[in-house]
Amino acid sequence: MNDAIDLTRKRDRDFTAAVEAQSGQNVSTCYQCGNCLAGCPAGFVYDLQANQIMRGVQLGLKDQVLNSRSIWMCLSCSTCSLRCPNNIDVAEVMETLRHMARKEGRVAVPKVEKFWFSFLDTVRKFGRTYEIGTMVLYMLRSLRVFTDVDLAPQALAKQKLGFKPHSIPNGGAEAVGRIMTRYKERAKREGVRP
């Protein structure tokens, strides 16, 4: 991994403004203290660390940032956001970058997107996460049907997986389904594949 940011790449001067407008964060105030990466639980799989992503946004390095694996590997745990001395919600910036990348058809880690859609499909149907349903959908979408099947007996023995989804009382699942439907309609209007 090369830690240097390649400044010879084409810059998009409007990119910084677009990220700041869409995320509601003043990325320009990041002074590269490194607090965001100090406790990042996913940083070990990043090709660019969070502070490098922020610097790339500041410099208008749109292609480098939107093609990065890091924006897809971010867990959205907000550890970075809580540690930022300038109160930049770095997790929100990463989310914004994922949306921008998807809108342009850039998906650096397709498996993550497949998992994301599998998770959202179970939430839409059942109103909350349904682990086995998410796993089955992900395995089918990624064509990795027997991946991690050997872990199932342990997970079942520890009661970490339920065969049936948990129910939500008082029409909660339907309400969540309506929210998800509105999201899909909005995404289509904005040109993003829901």
Task: Please describe what each predicted stretch is.
Residues 1-29, 35-39, 46-55, 62, ...:
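Non-ligating segments of multi-cofactor redox enzymes
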Residues 24-43, 68-88:
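Cysteine-centered iron-sulfur cluster-binding motifs in ferredoxin-type domains/subunits
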Residues 54-62, 70-76:
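A short glycine/small-residue-enriched secondary-structure motif
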Residues 65:
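A compact, surface-exposed functional segment
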